[in-house]
Structure formats: C-alpha cells, structure tokens
Amino acid sequence: MSLIPSIFGGRRSNVFDPFSQDLWDPFEGFFTPSSALANASTARDVAAFTNARVDWKETPEAHVFKADLPGLKKEEVKVEVEDKNVLQISGERSKENEEKNDKWHRVERASGKFMRRFRLPENAKMEEVKATMENGVLTVVVPKAPEKKPQVKSIDISGAN
C-alpha cells in the first residue's frame, strides 16, 4: 500500500485485500490540492451513474433489457421509442439539497443524467414495448414479430419417363 495517495482516483479496491477497504483516513486530501481531490471524486461519482449498465438478451419471443438503477424512482426514468427501431432509456438523479449548516464528511452517491440507446432489428414490435421497475431494476420487454416462413409451392415436373 502506497504512503502517498493518488490524485487520480484514491485508493486501491480489492475485496480480497483487507488493507484496501475504504476506511476513514485522517490524512485524506492532506497531500493533494483539495480542488484536484474534489474534481477526481466528483468525476468518478458522476461517471459511475452516467454509464448505466444495461443487459440485452434475445429470447425466441422478445428482446429483454435490464438496467440496474438503484435509488431511482420510476418517475425519474424514461423509456422511449424513436425512429421506429431505436429504444432509448434515460433518467436523472438530482443532487441532494445542501443546507448551509450541514457538514458533509463523505459524498459517494452519484447524481447526474444517463442515456442509453439501442438500435433494434426489423423483427422488433416497437408498438408493444412494456417496461417495469422493481427494486431498482428496470426491465424493458420488446416483443418480436413471428418469423415469416417462406411459402413453398411444389411444381409438377413434366416430361417423358
């Protein structure tokens, strides 16, 4: 473990290393300019939220999207369809109001906006999209149109035999 803290992101993070846990550090910010430390921390927190992770799987019946959005209410999330085949998931978490007399020791929860867009294949039924949100997980289901089977017509073969 380094004795000199990094201005580019703080400490190591390894769940298997008991010395890398985020413990209270009386010297945090002492060796770095406070503005650099604040900017690195803020950038890291905002980046964690703005890069919302989304899983996309395809089943025989539908395209299913799942996004982890902990702490967001369904009113803070939008699911939209644009250009007939683009699914857009967006949202915003507002920063908590600060009181003049409050003394913050640590701010780790991220705030900001996020937006993810997915271009879906032709077989997506965009007019039937359904979205649910439960326990901070947004699930969007886009049904698929049934596959069109080609019509096959048998042709009799004429000739001498």
Swiss-Prot record:
It comes from Arabidopsis thaliana (Mouse-ear cress). Pfam families: HSP20. PANTHER family: HEAT-SHOCK PROTEIN 20 FAMILY MEMBER (PTHR11527). InterPro entries: A-crystallin/Hsp20_dom, HSP20-like_chaperone, Small_HSP. PROSITE patterns: SHSP. One of its GO terms (cellular component) is cytoplasm. May form oligomeric structures. Binds to AKR2A. This is 18.1 kDa class I heat shock protein. Residues 45-160 form the sHSP domain. The keyword Cytoplasm applies. One of its GO terms (biological process) is heat acclimation. Induction: Accumulates after heat shock. The keyword DNA-binding does not apply. Belongs to the small heat shock protein (HSP20) family. Keywords: Cytoplasm, Stress response.
